[in-house]
Structures are given as C-alpha cells and as structure tokens.
Design a protein with these regions (language model features):
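Short glycine-biased active-site loop of nucleotidyltransferases that positions the nucleotide triphosphate
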Residues: 63-64, 169, 299-304, 348-355, ...
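Short catalytic/ligand-binding loop motif for oxyanion handling, primarily in non-cytosolic enzymes
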Residues: 200-202, 260-262, 297-300, 345-348, ...
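Carbohydrate-interacting/catalytic domains
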Residues: 1-247, 257, 270-285, 549-552, ...
Length: 907
C-alpha cells in the first residue's frame, strides 16, 4: 500500500533543514490507509541512495517521494515499532542503524517547567550530552536551549557534520531542542548547528558540555557517566559539620598552568600536579588552595576568566576524571579546594554563548546592559530565568560533581552596578531610577541560598571591590549571603603603606590602622592575590623599599602581619619564592630561586608562621568577632610600631611590628595578663634571613600600667620585624619554639629529597653551607579545648595618664652595609640579658628547590585581556582616615641603632 503523501510544506522545511518539529513527519506514526490500520514510517537521510526498514528477520524497501523523504506503510502494526534502518549510500556503503526519530523525549514536563522558572537544581543532568540506553539501544541524548531558533541539529563525525541529518525536536514552548542519537558514545566530538530567525546558520559548542577540545576546533566531547571512585568521604563529612568561619583558613592561590611545568615547558596533567602541589601546600601550612578558573577557556592569557565551557574542566591538564582525582588528592592531604568562578561576564566568541540562537540569548540585546566596555565581554542577562538557572546549576555542578569546597565569585561589583565601568549615557537605570542591578542582586541571593542550604560547610567568597553594604550578611537580614568578602580596601592600603620608605612611614601610619574601623562591617578575607603582581605593578618583593636586605625583611613583616591580623588570608603562589619578576602565566614559577639563602629564609618563615597560625586558635577562632582582637599600641606612628592582641576566650597572643630599620631596645607594651610571655616567632631571626638582633626568648609582665592595661612587658624590637608572643600558661607556649625549629628541619629535608633531579647544570644552585643540628624538640602536650577555659582578659579602659614627654627623634635608618662587614647585634636591654636567643637551626642548605625538571625560561611581559582597569577599594564609601586614639602611656626609651644590618650582596 502507498503511504499517504506528507505535507509538501512540512516536507520541504525538513529537507531544507528548516524544521523545528522533525518528529511530526519522521519516525513511526499510526496511520489508516484505505481502511487498513497500520504504521507509516518515514525517514530522511541526505545522500542516501536507498533505505530499507529492518524488523527482526524481515526487510522492507522504502519508497522515495518527490521531496526526498523515504516512506513505508506496515499494515496490522501499532506504534511503537522497534525497527532499524538499512541505509545504502551512493558510494556503495551500507549502514544499519536505529532510527533516532522513533524514541520519546528524554526530558519530562517537570524538567522543562523547573528550567523555565529558573529552579532546576540538577540541570546538567538533563541538558547537554548524556550517554544512555533507551529500550535496550545505546546512544547519546542531546538537549540544548535555543528559544528563538527555527531549527537546531546536532552534528559530528557520526553524520559527516551535516546539519540535515539529525534535526532536533523543539519541546513545546520551553525553547529546548532534544534528540536521542543511537550509536553515538563516549569521546565523540559534536556541535550544534542552529538556524537563526533570519535564516543564518551558526555552529556552536554545547553550553552544557562536560568536556571540550582545545582550539581551533572547540568541539564539545561526549563524556561517559562518571565512574570515578572517590576516597574523600571522611573529608566531606567533616566539612558538613564544621563552621568555616571559626576554623583556620590560609589560602594558597594557584594558576595550575604556571605553578610548575615539565620538560620543554610542557603543561603538567592534573594527576602530575596533584601530589606535588598537595605536598608543597601542606608543608607551607596552608589550609586551602584557590584555583584560578579551570573552567574551559580558549585564551590562556585570560588566566581562565574568559570562559567558553562552563561545565568542562579545561582539557589542558586532562579529563574531568583527572580533575576529580586532583581534588581527591587535595582532600586526602587535608587541603580544601576553592574555585574561582566567573558568573559576571563571558567572551564574545562566536562559537560559544554569544548570540547563541542568532539573538541575545544569554546576554542583553541592548549593549547598555549587555556589553562590558572595559573588558570587551558580554554581561549575563540575570532577568532571564533560564540564564539564571544555567549559572545556578553550574555552581552546584562543580560542588556536587567535583567536590569543590567553595566558590570565589569573580567581579561581583560589576554585577551589582548597572553603571560599572561606564560613562554617562552608556547605561540604563533600573525600574526605580537607581543604578543597582536588581536582577543580579536577586540572583546572588538565590545562589548563596542554594549553595549553603544544599551543601553545609561549602563557602562562597565575593570579590566585591566597592562599599556595597551587607555582602556577607544573612539574606534574611537584607544581605547577599556570602560567607566572606575580599577586603580590597585593606589590601590597597597595606601595600601602599609597605611601599613607603620607612623614614616616611609615620605619615602613612593610618593606612595600617584604618581597616579596623570597618573590620566587622563584613566578614573579610585579606587577599594578596595575582592581580597585585602583574601589569607593571611589580612583584611583592619589588614593591618593598630599601636595599635587598630591607626588602626581604619588609616582605616577611607583611606576610606575618597579613596572617596574624583578623580575617582569613590569601597569598598568590610564588610569594614564598621572593621573585624579582612579575608573574608570567606562560612559564613555571622560578623554583630555582630556592637555591638562594634569602629565599630559603623566606620559605622557612612562611612555614613557621603558617604552622603557628594553624596551631593557635586565637588567630582564627574569632576572626569576625570584635572580641577576637584588641589594639595594644596603635598610636606610635613616630616610631612606626604597631601592636595588637588576638583572643580566643581561652588563649591569646601578642603581636608587635617594628616597621623601620631602627631597632627598639626595651620597648614597653601593655600586656593582657601577668606572667611570662614567650617570643614564639621573630621574623628577624637569622634562620629567616634576619639580622639576629638580640631578643629575649621570654619576658615577664610587670605590674606597671601601660596602654590601658594593668600590667606591661618590655621587649626589644628588631629592625623591620614582627614578633609574636604567647603567655607561658598556655600549655604549648614554650614548646612551640622548639616545634617550629623542628618543623624547619623536617620541611627542609622533604625539599632536599625532591630537589630538581633533572635540572640542568646551568641552573643548579650553589651548594649552601651545612646547617647546625637542631636540638630534639619535645612533643607538645595536647592543646586545651577552646572556649571552655576562662575568657582571656579584655583590655580595660585606660586610666587617665600623665602627659607623656615627646619621644626623642629616631635616627635615620642606616645605609646599606658594605659586603665585607658582618652584622653585629645591638646590646640587649637589662630585661633581656637573662634569657638567650632561642635556638633555631639555619635552613641554609636544608631548604632546597622542589622537583622542577626544566630550567625556567626568560620571563616576558605579561598581558591580560580580561581586565584593563584596576579595581576600586572595598572599604566604606567615606574614605577619610581617622586614626584611633587610645590614651597614651609614658613614652618608650630612646631607640638603639645597631651598627649595621646583615650584609647584602643583591641590590
């Protein structure tokens, strides 16, 4: 019997590749012909000479109509029919395959409903490409959102990249096109061919692809269902029970492509990087790493911030399962993994999200809303539910599929303000006449609510560079709901201060104190990030003033200050190397620098301060509570001395910084309690590359009121240094000195055992002198349970003090010494004579370079396409600095200047 002729118009649209509903014609449909019930089967295959229907052992040739469709009527049959198609091509090839148009949709009505409302929390399981089996037939289900397309096809090598072969079905008014393609399996390359409303064809990668190839192809890659065997169950359970705000958080920011490279500048794989990075980070005392975006990006020079594949870990370093193994290795080492995530903008690549279906699909049509003039990128349309769902599901995808412990949300300020980076006339006001992006605000609240409610213990960190209020406050209180916010104001002020010549720092003293005026308005993270060591801003070491000795001393003080002040801390990779160069994303870090004694000292200092930070909860338990911090000496700008206490209810520490090259003998400080204080960290110790200026290892508090306290101590302050003191009644206060000494030796041995074996002779560092043997450190007793002991005394209100005489003018900082002269420590004060300087072994030979198989190439000037302008400060809008004014005590004694700091050979 002859099959009823299909509608000429529908048939022509299908043959021309213009149909959004190919299933209306193709596949098996119940039909009555001449009073006989049966099934009409239609097929379309470009370039086919003939097609036959195969059902079991039977085979029926199909008839070809005038439009190029093949058809067959089977009487006494009912749909569905499990038939196959035998296709014979003009070149004689014969292919037997299942017909993709005989299968039902793979998305249900509820999936589409939730997606169109922006509430589908597992959207990545429905859209994109999914290897699956339907009715015993293996294949891949494809689905994509293209609401204004007139036709969407999936193309690949499996159909000769011909958009007519696998035209997809539009599911109602959802804007989603779907098709199950039998026979397509894992690792197949594919793209979507989209016909726009104007008839133009666009070839796009899948926005939901789990993997992508590198350019110039940019094809999406079908991934099999994840079979990775996770081993971090204990980590995830502990994470869910912990309060991240009351736990230590010292973050190492990493760009995986340039942290370390292999021979001939080869990129290392995720599995190669994982054990090396975990070992290094753990040894340094960091608790977390923060990865610059590993979401697939075409341009390496964007550092990952111009994302092309939001659901695909970059294939530069391996497969999605390789990245899972990377995270698993970190968790096994006790290291959390934060991911830099970019929901603020996307690049204008024609093969990606830009005008995805020929219209402004993910972005705004109006460039005053949809374009970012500074970065040359598009801004997401947060008013569109499907776009919000894309981003929301993406955030949850990284947490659930890759066990990420937190998201650092990039460029939040650009999301919040409609006029961000724009001149007058370049932006549109919101419906209330303001400049706030109300839809972006709503999205950020939705994001934080979903992350924190579904995954307790996972954090979100806002890179928000303005004074937008309540960024880290609960959503129920009108906040955005972030866990932490980068303190950009503190970062800019602190670096500005440390750039100042020490002789003039008294005029910049409030740059260090001002941040405490707004410290508790948000929950802050203190970042010294990648943005501060690029674009001619210089490396951290080169920002420091003075000769080479002073620069390293300044850098140690900066690091110690950053870690011991309130707030969580972040350092960009390479800080520990003390490089003279800015970061270059095209090559490895300069690991060979660890052959230099100064860098060995810097590395040892970072290890020591990291260990001290993790061991003592007073440095992190109350980071975001005013009771966790108190000024001791805030007003001594004449001598550039700053002192503060850190408290934890049961423990406390005293921190004092002397930020000039002039040592201060017998400097008196108010003390929170009576008793003995041990100096547990001294950045001026020779172990760390310091001058070794004599400092008592312990000082006794005296009943002498000072700085508002009932008791005080006198301590000698080395030049350009930070000291940390712990009260003796803390069980491990004295032991920590020996523990840190032992730590330096152990870590040095670890570095020595893995020193770059394949390093070329040219780059091999000179052999450093052998360090003396360290005394065996006693095992520290168990730490006391926090918050159960009596509360540490708070600084009382200061009594009215007698008017203090003006301190004598400090002498000018000494000139850089000549190489021949050795440093002589200044004579210690009477109070320091009884106690000797604590013995800490020199790390000169001990700290050797890590494994680095190739010499570092010459560095090049870095460029960045993502951001052209520096970001503004995150401190409050009113930036007038009002110094804190405690009641002054009697002035300290006249400073004693050492004959000279240690010799410097580097300038």
């Amino acid at each position: 019997m002859t099959v009823p002729t299909a509608s000429a118009d529908a048939a022509l649209r299908l043959v021309r590749g213009e149909s959004a509903v190919p299933h209306d014609l193709l596949g098996a449909h119940p039909t009555t012909v001449e009073g006989v019930d049966g099934v009409a089967i239609r097929a379309f295959q470009p370039n086919a000479a003939s097609i036959a229907v195969v059902l079991g052992e039977q085979r029926w040739p199909m008839e070809r109509d005038a439009h190029g469709l093949f058809a067959l009527f089977l009487s006494d049959r009912t749909a569905p029919v499990a038939y196959r198609l035998e296709v014979t091509f003009g070149d004689g090839r014969v292919v037997l395959r299942d017909d993709p148009y005989r299968f039902l949709p793979t998305l249900g009505e509820m999936d589409l409903h939730l997606f169109n409302e922006g509430r589908h929390l597992r959207l990545w399981e429905k859209l994109g490409a999914h290897v699956c089996e339907i009715d015993g037939v293996a294949g891949t289900s494809f689905a994509v959102w293209a609401p204004n397309a007139t036709r969407v096809s999936v193309i690949g090598a499996f159909n000769g990249w011909d958009g007519r072969a696998h035209q997809m079905r539009l599911l109602g008014a959802s804007g989603v096109f779907e098709l199950f393609v039998p026979g397509v399996g894992a690792d197949a390359l594919y793209k979507f061919e989209i016909r726009s409303p104007t008839g133009s064809l666009r070839v796009k990668t899948d926005p939901y692809a789990f993997a992508m190839e590198q350019g110039p192809g940019h094809a999406s890659i079908v991934q099999a269902v994840g079979t990775y065997d996770w081993k971090d169950g204990a980590w995830l359970a502990q994470r869910a029970d912990a309060d991240p705000l009351r736990e230590p958080m010292l973050v190492y920011e990493v760009h995986l492509s340039s942290w370390m490279r292999g021979e001939h500048n080869r990129l290392l794989t995720y599995r190669e990087l994982a054990p090396r990075l975990a070992e290094h980070v753990k040894r340094m005392g960091f608790t977390h790493i923060e990865l610059l975006p590993v979401l697939e990006h075409p341009f390496g020079g964007s550092w990952g911030y111009q994302v092309g594949g939001y659901f695909a870990p970059t294939s530069r370093h391996g497969s999605p399962d390789d990245f899972r193994a990377f995270v698993d290795t970190m968790h096994e080492a006790g290291i959390g993994v934060l991911l830099d995530w970019v929901p603020a903008h996307f690049p204008k690549d024609d093969w990606a999200l830009r005008r995805f279906d020929g219209t402004a699909c993910y972005e705004h049509e109006d460039p005053r809303l949809g374009d970012h003039p500074e970065w040359g990128t598009h801004i997401f349309n947060y008013a569109r539910y499907e776009v919000r769902n894309f981003l929301l599901a993406n955030a949850l995808y990284w947490i659930e599929e890759f066990h990420i412990d937190g998201l650092r949300v990039d460029a939040v300020a650009s999301m919040l303000y409609l006029d961000y980076g724009r001149e007058a006339g370049q932006w549109l006001r919101n419906r209330f006449g303001g400049r706030e992006n109300l839809e972006a605000v709503s999205f950020l609240k939705q994001l934080n609510h979903a992350v924190h409610s579904l995954h307790p213990g996972v954090i979100t960190v806002a890179e928000e560079s303005t004074s937008w209020p309540r960024v880290t406050h609960p959503i129920s209180e009108g906040g955005l709901g972030f866990t932490l916010k980068w303190n950009m104001g503190w970062m800019h002020d602190t670096l500005d201060y440390f750039k100042v010549d020490p002789f003039f720092r008294k005029g910049a003293h409030d740059k260090l104190t001002f941040a405490m005026m707004y410290e508790y308005s948000e929950r802050f993270m203190n970042p010294l990030s990648h943005d501060e060591v690029v674009h001619l801003k210089q490396s951290l070491l080169e920002k420091m003033p003075g000769d080479i000795w002073q620069r390293f001393a300044n850098l140690r003080a900066l690091i110690g200050y950053s870690i011991t002040r309130p707030g969580k801390s972040l350092f960009f990779m390479g800080t520990e190397l003390g490089s003279h160069h800015e970061w270059n994303h095209d090559i490895s870090l300069e690991w060979h620098l660890l052959g230099d004694a100064r860098r060995q000292g810097l590395l040892a200092f970072m290890q020591a301060v990291g260990a001290l930070y993790r061991q003592h909860s007073c440095f992190w338990r109350r980071d975001h509570e005013p009771s966790g911090f108190g000024w001791i000496d805030v007003s001594d700008k004449e001598q550039s001395v700053l002192a503060y206490g850190r408290y934890d209810g049961s423990t406390h520490a005293m921190v004092v910084l002397n930020l000039t090259p002039v040592p201060r003998a017998a400097y008196r400080l108010g003390a929170p309690s009576m008793g003995t204080y041990h100096v547990v960290l001294n950045s001026d110790a020779t172990t760390f590359g310091g001058s070794g200026f004599a400092v008592a290892e312990a000082v006794e508090a005296e009943p002498v009121p000072y700085h508002g306290f009932s008791q005080s101590v006198t301590v000698s302050l080395p030049p350009m240094s930070i000291l940390v003191m712990l009260p003796a009644e803390q069980p491990d206060a004295r032991a920590v000195v020996d523990v840190l000494a032992e730590l330096v030796v152990e870590n040095a041995a670890a570095l020595r055992s893995g020193a770059g074996k394949s390093r070329s002779k040219k780059d091999k560092p000179a052999k450093a002198p052998k360090p003396p043997k360290a005394e065996k450190a006693p095992k520290p007793p168990k730490a006391e349970k926090a918050d159960k002991a009596e509360k540490a005394p708070k600084p009382p209100k200061a009594p009215k003090a007698e008017k203090a005489p003006k301190p004598e003018k400090a002498p000018k900082p000494p000139k850089a010494p000549k190489e021949a002269k050795a440093a002589k420590p200044a004579k210690p004060s009477k109070s320091a004579k009884a106690a000797k300087q604590p013995k800490v072994p020199t790390a000169a030979k001990a700290v050797e370079p890590m494994k680095q198989p190739v010499a570092t190439p010459a560095r090049k000037t870095t460029t960045r396409a993502r951001k052209a302008a520096a970001k503004t400060s995150s401190s409050p809008a009113v930036r007038k600095r009002t110094p804190v004014s405690p009641v002054p005590g009697p002035s300290n004694k006249k400073p004693v200047t050492p004959k000279s700091p240690p010799p410097a050979t580097e300038t």
